[in-house]
Amino acid sequence: MKNNEIDTIAAISTPIGRGGIGIIRVSGKLVPEVAMKLFNKIPKPRTAEYLTCIDHNGSIMEKVITLFFPEPHSFTGENILEIHGHGGQMILDLLLDRILNISSRIRLANPGEFTERAFLNEKIDLIQAESIADIINATSYQAAKSACNSLQGHFSNQIRIILNKITNFRTYIESTLDFSDQEISDISYQHIYNTLQNIIDNTNQICKLTHSGVLLRDGIKVVIAGKPNAGKSSLFNSLINKDRAIISNISGTTRDILHEYIQLNGIAFHIIDTAGFKKNSTNEIELIGMQKSKYELSKADHILWVIDSTDYSHNNSYNNIINSLKKELSSNNIEAVFITIIRNKSDLSFEHNGIDTTNKYACITLSALLNHGIDLLKKHLYDSAMLQIHKNSNFSSVEENQGNFIARKRHLKILQKVFQYLLSAKTQLQYNMTVNDCFAEDLKKAHEELAQIFGKLTPDDLLEEIFRAFCIGK
């Protein structure tokens, strides 16, 4: 640990403001001294005690409940004292100030420093540390549940299995390289190939599960797009159930990107309203808006392509609609995301609201202005999200998910790199029909890359970025 981290740290762990209970947390070597100064005794370990807290003159400050966890059997691996008092901000500030003035070696904790100490003292790994923040910041029931699974080690255990396999495999390969002047036998070659293929298959599967974990954490990104005045903003307002976007008959009202989160049956959805795609526009602001819209489309998990149903006949418009959409999307992206065509303004075209799934892309007829067909669209969004998550995991509903974990884009990028290094090693093996230094180097890179998920070999600036994203007191 760093020199400044040998200090004893203290912070208010509950949110700022008034509440029924306020909690102060203290961690470090000087916790027993703090307890003696505040209570004239050291509380019983792992036992809730109702004690009187006194100031430096011996006057009563507060009646509190204390919890004392001696090192190393605590969250941080250090002595920890939790003080549970009344939730008024003034009394909490006074108690914290009293603690900080006991010794010059007691200071206010940095954001996330309690969790950082738990990581540095090997009480948790980096995945579990990140999952604590994900529990706090969860935007849906499913995200919170999956983050709890990650905290329990579900994700870490699966990564550790692959890491151990690579470690053992590297040990075997290094011993083989010691006899590099001899060709390996057919039996040895097949063993090496099968072992590598098994690791590749395991890594590929965990990549898929991790992608599902990223979707659960960040929410399904739903981008509403289309031509100006098709009713995109009306649809946006209907989905989020509030008047967030300006609605007008004037074409091109939306110039910037609007973001909102909603939750459908425990799954978070990131709903995005975009500027319309106007043909042959020379307006600089409109062009900037359309460029932003294209960027959001390139990052979408699900695209709602909105059309004015009065501009397209129901029977002959499908191919024209898809062609107009393809103009705004890269050829790669259009096959990688869910796309739903929204035939809006059914109140003006006098069409029946409903969903048509006979073509490649589902088509939903609705009236965003009158809120007709919105429930059908929400069900479609949820069903599509479950398909996206289900194709990478082993559950088909929120209730069935008992072992899925939450993940971050950082984890997915690392695993994708590991997968590529392993594929490179396989190519080397197939081409040379033996192991060599290049093969061993690919395995080494895969090993080192995967270790970064746990925080091993992870740059200090990345660790600092991860822990400083926590609130103070966590």
From Swiss-Prot:
Pfam family, one: MnmE_helical
EC number: 3.6.-.-
Subcellular location: Cytoplasm
Cofactor(s) it depends on: K(+)
Residues that coordinate or bind GTP: 229-234, 248-254, 273-276
Free-text cofactor note: Binds 1 potassium ion per subunit.
UniProt: Mg(2+) binding residues: S233, T254
Family matches, as HAMAP family: GTPase_MnmE
Protein name: tRNA modification GTPase MnmE
Origin species: Blochmanniella floridana
